[in-house]
Amino acid sequence: MDRNRQLLLVIGVLFHFFYLWSIFDIYFVSPLVHGMDHHKSTWTPPAKRLFLIVGDGLRADKTFQKLTHPRTGEEKYLAPYLRSLALNNGTWGISNTRMPTESRPGHVAMIAGFYEDVSAVTKGWKENPVDFDSFFNQSKHTYSFGSPDILPMFAFGDGVVPGRIDVCMYGHEFEDFTASSIELDAYVFHHLDELMHNSTTNATLNEELRQDGNVFFLHLLGPDTAGHAYRPYSAEYYENIEYIDRKLEEVIPQINKFFGDDQTAFVFTADHGMSDFGSHGDGHPDNTRTPLIAWGAGVKKPIHLQDVSNLEEQLLKQSPENSGFESTYFDTWELDHLVRNDVNQADIASLMAYLIGANYPANSVGELPLGYIDADPVTKARALYANSLAIVEQYFVKEQEVYNHQFKFKPYSPFEEKSIQKYQQEIESLIDQLEKSGSGSKDEIEKKVIAKIEELMKTTLDGLTYLQTYNWLLLRSIVTLGFFGWIVYSFNIFLKLFVLNEDELKIPPEFSVTLVGIFGALAISINYLLFYQNSPFNYYMYAAFPLYFWYTILNEKKYLITGIESFLHGISNTTKFLIVVSFIGMYEGIAYGFFERVMFSIILIIIGLYPLLVHGAHKVSGLMKTIWFITCLLMCTFTNLDPVKIESLFQINVGTILALIVSIMGTKQVFKRTQVGPIQKQLIIAQIAIIPIILFATNISVLSLQARTGLPLYSQILGWITFIVSLIVLPILHFLNPSSDYQLRLLIIFLTFVPTFIILTISFELLFYVGFSLILLQWLSIEELLKFSHKDLVETFEKTGKLPKGYWLQVIRITIIGFFFLQLAFFGTGNIASISSFSLDSVYRLIPIFDPFSMGALLMIKLIIPYVLLSTCLGIMNHQLEIKKFTISTLIISTSDFLSLNFFFLVRTEGSWLDIGVSISNYCLAILSSLFMLILELISSVVLSGVEYNSDGTKLDFEPISYRVRKRKVT
């Protein structure tokens, strides 16, 4: 491999991996600090113990609203007991979670009061215990029951007091999506009952259970499992909620009877919700709205709206429109007559700490929700003040950390205007007044002190954000220079690899002492600055790339200028302008398409017209132009369909029939025009024969799973056999008996992936696969007709020693269209705006037991298949244009980061969690597109190894005209 190509690959991979992570280092750095003193929530705890009950994946609306049961048709409340607690015994509201709406971040927020950065979902669960303080760690002892994915992460770790947290959990084999999810929750209730029963015969255990400050954590995974498997509107999901409600109605009185002192507090909530699609992770309201009900010792009883003094203000506060809900969201809840107390999920940790008098978790940023507390004004004020001091403690530690590593530190201006000490003096003075005041003025003073404490908390949290983003300007400038540097640097390598001739490259760049001195001084200065700021290793890499890129660019500017002249040789200024407009238009259109998929439809229509507009359009027949335009119109259908798909056996069967028809017709055409050996014929017939077999297995699996009878073993085995044979065994046999015809090779690749798509599709994905294959095949044919003929290339080369004028224009066009198809391969069936657009329904046909890595691998295979088709197409394009391997992909790589740069500046840290999540996902997908191009044509070089092109009888590893031009002597 050429040294420049090796350099491009190595540096390209490193650059994109490091810069992929840059948004997390800049925008989403965890505010985690260590070394704070603890602050006790209250010296007069109202409860001796607390039960935290978490319904994993439980939506707020399904918990409270009246619903029609899908199995019985009865209109009912699914959780009448929990509703009765909200109506008669405690306080209720909506707990608003943050993105990512996954189990680990959700539990960390409610138990530690801390929002992990977005990268938390990459840390796993059991294998990565939380590395910060938690409410459990501040309890006397915690007894936890439930899932092996959740319990261990709080029970182990450097900061956990050994032996403080007990875990009782089932094995992973219990998490079977085709079995009853109720069994998971039954396990929890059974073992809680067993624990209390054992204490009657074990005096030591009995004494331990009755200690003040104990916590009992019941993690109920059933709703999440049922929601994933059957959707949150299914009978299974509803029945799981009903089961939890019935068991709580039994268990709560038993708990009160067991302890016999009415000193138990209860909190019922969820870690996240569940989308209608049966997934979670993004910021959709169905995922972020969870129920919260608290009752028992220390919790305020329900307050009727008619009893509040500021009725108008309260009505305005909890009206759907003013509190961020749809106008009809609460319509059937029949809780409108009660005060609703909504909280942020991290506030739950502060509430629980107060109820049993524990220290606030050291890293908690939650605010004690006073609406849930039944206490006198002074107690509430002191508890909230202690809460604020715990947050102030974090600010002091973080400020010192930043101050120690800055040449010149600029303090947070609001605390310059009014110091924390001043806030403390005012608050303590107001609390003293509150203690001494009479009943007449107490309410007014209480409002003042609470407002002052909340002001301190908000200012402190804003101050923490200020400290977190202290070096934003420097880092964003470095990363921006890095992106622009990479774009120019990689384009320069493209020119050296594919455009400049060898004699031009033999003249080395002149050594410039000035240039070395300038960049040497810059490197020393930036590295010293980063060292002084105690920056992590990643920061040094962010700075190293732009320094290297821009030094190389300026040092090799002669290559860049000469190469651009050769690349644009013979292209008019008007055409150059149109090229720039096309590049900008395509990349900006794609960027907009990340938010509105309809833009991909508009671009497809424009691409459908391009054979009419380009030079040489007369070479393409009217019939081919018409078929091409119709195909582009049909492909628009997929980018307008809802990416959140519902399983449809009808669409699966229709897609399979279409794939079978295309397979048979394609086979007949290839057999007619190509001499195919007997072994290859048998293998292709076997590939086609597998299609109805795997369709049969898929139908059996889908019908059984939809009927809730589980996954039949024989259909699972048949599915795996056909999956492995079609994807692994038959391709290997083809490899052992290779064909040199490129159309036959394309047919084999198409047939290889049809069975995989059948068993892993839930809706229209197979139809998209067939359409995408056909549009790529037509694109190949059109570009073959539009290219310079081999004869013209040879004649021009022999006369001038150069390529024809405008030769690279077709490469530019293919690059623009190819990058669009790279995005279409994903957006044709998916939408990055919703993590929930990836369904697990299909993988249940092969893996019914919860196994995130295996399930994720199957989904990745399904996502990668269209890219393999595209890589094969680009590989053949290189040959058709008689250019070297990797020419097209290298040009795409050098320009595609304009899209990444777009999304780097569109990353959001404020607004809805859906918007924040989308901005992160967009950036990651854009930068991975560039990285993925490095892999695509490597794949094509493997799958097209030894293929011959019939028009000139040469192989794909022939020496193309463009390469002979590069080797000519400079005259």
Curated annotation (Swiss-Prot):
Glycans are attached at residues 89, 137, 198, 202. Its EC number is 2.-.-.-. It comes from the Eukaryota. Disulfide bonds: none annotated. It is found in: Endoplasmic reticulum membrane. The keyword Transferase applies. It is an enzyme of class 2 (transferase). Residues 30-477, 532-533, 596-597, 641-645, 704-716, 769-813, 878-885, 945-971 are lumenal. Pathway: Glycolipid biosynthesis; glycosylphosphatidylinositol-anchor biosynthesis. The keyword Membrane applies. GO terms for biological process: cell wall organization; GPI anchor biosynthetic process. Its main location: endoplasmic reticulum. Residues 1-8, 499-510, 555-574, 619, 667-682, 738-745, 835-856, 907-923 are cytoplasmic. Pfam families: Phosphodiest (PF01663), PigN (PF04987). InterPro entries: Alkaline_phosphatase_core_sf, GPI_EtnP_transferase_1, GPI_EtnP_transferase_1_C, Phosphodiest/P_Trfase, PIGN_N. Gene3D superfamilies: Alkaline Phosphatase, subunit A (3.40.720.10). It is a multi-pass membrane protein. GO terms for cellular component: endoplasmic reticulum membrane. The chain crosses the membrane at residues 9-29, 478-498, 511-531, 534-554, 575-595, 598-618, 620-640, 646-666, 683-703, 717-737, 746-768, 814-834, 857-877, 886-906, 924-944. Keywords: Cell wall biogenesis/degradation, Endoplasmic reticulum, Glycoprotein, GPI-anchor biosynthesis, Membrane, Transferase, Transmembrane, Transmembrane helix. One of its GO terms (molecular function) is mannose-ethanolamine phosphotransferase activity. PANTHER family: GPI ETHANOLAMINE PHOSPHATE TRANSFERASE 1, PHOSPHATIDYLINOSITOL GLYCAN, CLASS N. Belongs to the PIGG/PIGN/PIGO family. PIGN subfamily. This is GPI ethanolamine phosphate transferase 1. It comes from Candida albicans (strain SC5314 / ATCC MYA-2876).
